[in-house]
Amino acid sequence: MTADSVLSIPPYKADDQDVVAELNSRFGAETFTVQSTCTDMPVLWVAREKLIEVLRFLRNLPRPYVMLYDLHGVDERLRTQRRGLPEADFSVFYHLLSIERNSDVMIKVALKEGDLKLPSATGIWPNANWYEREIWDMYGIHIEGHPHLTRILMPPTWEGHPLRKDYPARATEFDPYSLSAAKQDLEQEALRFKPEEWGMKRGGEHEDFMFLNLGPNHPSAHGAFRIILQLDGEEIVDCVPEIGYHHRGAEKMAERQSWHSFIPYTDRIDYLGGVMNNLPYVLAVEKLAGIKVPQRVDVIRVMMAEFFRILNHLLYLGTYIQDVGAMTPVFFTFTDRQRAYKVVEAITGFRLHPAWYRIGGVAHDLPRGWDALVKEFVEWMPKRLDEYEKAALQNSILRGRTMDVARYDTRQALEWGVTGAGLRATGLDFDLRKARPYSGYENFEFEVPLAHNGDAYDRCMVKLGEMRQSLRIIEQCRRNMPEGPYKADHPLTTPPPKERTLQHIETLITHFLQVSWGPVMPANESFQMIEATKGINSYYLTSDGSTMSYRTRIRTPSYAHLQQIPSVIRGSMVADLIAYLGSIDFVMADVDR
């Protein structure tokens, strides 16, 4: 697929039934069990024996489901609200995305505890590799035909599978941890890289290869991230990215927090994204609850999300330029970020992790004088972007280090699940704010920055263009902020509006229950994806009619982007890898969750 062939993306087709008709025509309606959900996409269960055939059919349709967007599992054993669904102890879902249809479909497979096996989908989508490893790691589901089925988020010596319902969720449920010298040696040895296990040779016919650890503590790794490089001189023959050092069990935590109290945890996924992290989560919960927020809430949410897009991109710009050797710009970008944080702190009361969005609204209304602060920032920032473009991005050394480096095309990007600026730098105009508007983005005028070479330089230039468009959106929010409440008038709005809480005993009781036990969400499944700072971020929520989520799946863009590294960087130099890593825009909290 080329970018030119899909530049005209059709309107978003939520719950697209065309693909259901195509599947029924090819395999027969009796092959599938259709599940009704709030996910805005067809959800179909299929027998394991038919799985690969169905997936391959969807991948090869005339308008194909070209991207394996997500792949994960659910422990179904304690789920009570399963009427009409196939009997299952565990289930695995495949979330597929079609650019040419602008629609999604989800295929599910039911598994019994004594027969936890699935065929690998890596022969259809190469990015299935890491997702299948994570299914094995978290649930113990064996993937037959996988090229190297090992743990990915947990240490290689770990015992058990953490997302199983019978696996403890709290540290106090374990024995006190101790690390003896012998155990430390064992753990260190387990991390020793053995090339033969990955199909690598220690040498060629006339040379020996060197194996070099880049990370897990390296300034260019942007976090606790290890890449084992197979080198012939300074040329990268192959490499193995190793993640998991920053894993905190965010999806497991979601099963022990109420729908309301999990909001602060979302801030820590992409810790540079601030309230941008809250948005897909609260939108997904609001789908479960049936809440429609006031227009003022939509505009406030959009404005603050775009502030954090700028904050993220400024840090990205400074560290990216620093990675290729220019030290000065990072100090300027960090100083400029303080201007944006001044506005964020005045409005939300916090800086890095406001946790400010609420189910049904935002924490409080905009303070007096907010518009003057926003106006000052929006008028000041464009000149700074002009300076960065002229002084840094037009610099001949930076251009020489990054142009035609780590280049990939649209087809490769889609095969590996790349989204955001990394995808748009290949020329594909796919931005969810335009293609699948949410939170009222359809009411704003802005452009989607594109490039066409798909290299490290283009990815940076797309990010610069996105900051300019974010300023346009913020200014429209300032000029057109509607009047009205900052929370929805709905029983599941959490917490309920303060004015009513102070005046009505029934609302006070509701407030007490919602912030202590948590609101009770109807049993169903919901899904929301957004155009986040680093690509597409989404929450897939399963409610069993309780105060807590039965299953929270967090799909982050950085996870997919790091899996692509070996396919892009083979044959390049180590210095090119540094430029490539800087151009991706990732943080390991977003990868490891």
UniProtKB/Swiss-Prot annotation:
Q: Where is this region: NADH dehydrogenase I subunit D?
A: 208-593
Q: Which compartment or compartments is the protein found in? A: Cell inner membrane
**Pfam families registered for this protein in UniProt:** Complex1_30kDa, Complex1_49kDa
SUPFAM superfamilies in the record, alphabetically?
Answer: HydB/Nqo4-like, Nqo5-like
Q: Provide the E.C. number(s) assigned to this enzyme.
A: 7.1.1.-
| Chief location | membrane
**Membrane topology of the entry:** Peripheral membrane protein
Q: Segment NADH dehydrogenase I subunit C: which positions? A: 1-184
Q: Which PROSITE patterns match?
A: COMPLEX1_49K (PS00535)
Domain of life the protein comes from: Bacteria
Give one GO molecular function term. Answer: NADH dehydrogenase (ubiquinone) activity
What catalytic activity is recorded?
A: a quinone + NADH + 5 H(+)(in) = a quinol + NAD(+) + 4 H(+)(out)
Q: Which keywords label this protein?
A: Cell inner membrane, Cell membrane, Membrane, Multifunctional enzyme, NAD, Quinone, Translocase, Transport, Ubiquinone
Any one GO cellular component localisation term in the record:
NADH dehydrogenase complex
Q: Which family does it belong to?
A: In the N-terminal section; belongs to the complex I 30 kDa subunit family. In the C-terminal section; belongs to the complex I 49 kDa subunit family.
The UniProt subunit note reads as follows: NDH-1 is composed of 13 different subunits. Subunits NuoB, CD, E, F, and G constitute the peripheral sector of the complex.
Role summary: NDH-1 shuttles electrons from NADH, via FMN and iron-sulfur (Fe-S) centers, to quinones in the respiratory chain. The immediate electron acceptor for the enzyme in this species is believed to be ubiquinone. Couples the redox reaction to proton translocation (for every two electrons transferred, four hydrogen ions are translocated across the cytoplasmic membrane), and thus conserves the redox energy in a proton gradient.
Under which name does UniProt file this protein?
A: NADH-quinone oxidoreductase subunit C/D
- Source organism per entry reads Azotobacter vinelandii (strain DJ / ATCC BAA-1303)
